[in-house]
A protein has these predicted regions:
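Nucleotide-activated donor-binding/catalytic signature segment of Leloir-type glycosyltransferases, i.e.
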Residues: 207-229
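Conserved acidic donor-binding segment of nucleotide-sugar-dependent glycosyltransferases
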Residues: 278-289, 296-302
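Aromatic "clamp/platform" in nucleotide-sugar-dependent glycosyltransferases that forms part
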Residues: 246
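Conserved donor-binding/catalytic core segment of Leloir-type glycosyltransferases
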Residues: 161-177, 183-187, 195
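Glycosyltransferase donor-sugar binding loop
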Residues: 170, 193-208
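Short alpha-helical donor nucleotide-sugar binding micro-motif in glycosyltransferases
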Residues: 106, 225-226, 233-238
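Membrane-proximal helix-turn-helix segments that form the acceptor-binding/catalytic region
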Residues: 93-112
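Short hydrophobic beta-strand element within catalytic cores of glycosyltransferases
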Residues: 263-266
Length: 333
């Protein structure tokens, strides 16, 4: 299937462009360019393969129409029932229905691509009838490479003295991302600055999340959604990336932090059990007390610097590597 044109279906993409899915689509565009595979986002143009990235009804219809026309359909499985839970208001109630829906969507394709072996195992447990392969969303390590200018821009913009230690996280205002624990830690650790980048419409989130982000703490900051360039500057300008997520299919922001050579502390959850060895590329914790202790030890230089090993892990998932793997997937189809 080499050199056949790919349609990156853009339907409903506007709804997710500020999420990890939107970032994944941008990475696919970059990977296709690097692999020398022609692609379009215009559905009216001729194509042989279609990439679908969302599970909205228009994507399902597009999948079925493409199949009827003899096109190859690759469905990217970014979502699972497990990472849908504890997200938006009412998500836990409809999670079983969500699982049925995404199973139906994914089964409409010829091949399912999902970011990790962990998410692949989850999907295999759904009884999907199509082959599933794991392929990282990838990371542009060149773009996120650490540099002093980026650090200075971040510190200057938010008027942060060089002596202040800064902890950041990136994500939606949803419980699954660990935002409640992030706020608790800011409250318990007034000597450090905590910045959460990202935004979610307040009408979509439960009251407990609204109350948490409205908490008035002098060291807790919610700058909202910022550009990719500003996120990079934040990685370079901060001292710790704190990723308290309860469930992920990969976590693109984690790859970004690895590429930026920032110390990382994650929640010890199943997806990262095999992906990261504790105290080798990242530090892991399970409770508020453990997070508090590890944050202090990392920021005060009492634990080894793991950033070089973390950076090497990001290089393994560099977009150039992903491009070649995607090309080999096409050739096998």
């Amino acid at each position: 299937m080499k050199q056949n044109k790919v349609l990156l279906y853009a339907g409903s993409l506007k709804l997710v462009e500020k999420s990890g899915v939107g970032q994944a689509v941008r990475h696919q565009m970059q990977a296709l360019k690097l692999a020398g595979v022609p692609f379009t986002m215009n559905s009216k143009e001729e194509y042989s393969i279609i990439h679908l990235n969302t599970i909205f009804p228009d994507s399902l219809l597009k999948s079925k129409r493409a199949k009827r026309k003899g096109k190859k359909v690759i469905y990217y499985a970014h979502s699972t029932m497990e990472d849908f839970r504890n997200s938006f208001r009412g998500s836990n109630l409809i999670a079983p229905l969500f699982k049925k829906w995404i199973t139906y969507c994914y089964n409409s394709g010829d091949l399912i691509i999902t970011p990790t072996e962990y998410s692949k195992e989850l999907l295999e447990g759904y009884g999907l009838k199509r082959p599933i392969v794991s392929l990282s969303n990838g990371i542009d390590t060149d773009f996120f490479k650490r540099n002093e200018e980026a650090r200075r821009r971040f510190r200057d913009k938010y008027q942060i003295p060089d002596t202040d230690k800064v902890v950041i996280s990136v994500g939606h205002y949803i419980e699954r991302k660990g935002i409640l624990d992030f706020v608790k830690l800011a409250e318990r650790m007034p000597n450090y600055q905590f910045y959460w980048f990202g935004y979610t419409n307040l009408n979509l989130i439960p009251n407990m999340i609204k109350e948490a982000i409205k908490k008035q703490l002098p060291n807790l900051h919610f700058p909202g959604y910022v550009t990719r360039e500003e996120v990079r500057d934040a990685y370079c300008g901060s001292d710790l990336f704190l990723f308290l997520t309860h469930e992920e299919t990969e976590g693109i922001v984690l790859l970004e932090a690895l590429a930026a050579k920032i110390p990382i502390l994650v929640r010890d959850i199943p997806i990262y059990k095999n992906m990261f060895k504790d105290r080798e590329t990242v530090y892991k914790g399970k409770s508020i007390e453990e997070f508090e202790e590890l944050i202090t030890q990392i920021l005060e230089g009492k634990l080894p610097d793991l950033t070089e090993k973390g950076y090497n892990m990001a290089l393994e998932r560099d977009i150039k590597v992903v491009a070649q793997k995607l090309l080999s997937i096409y050739e096998q189809e």
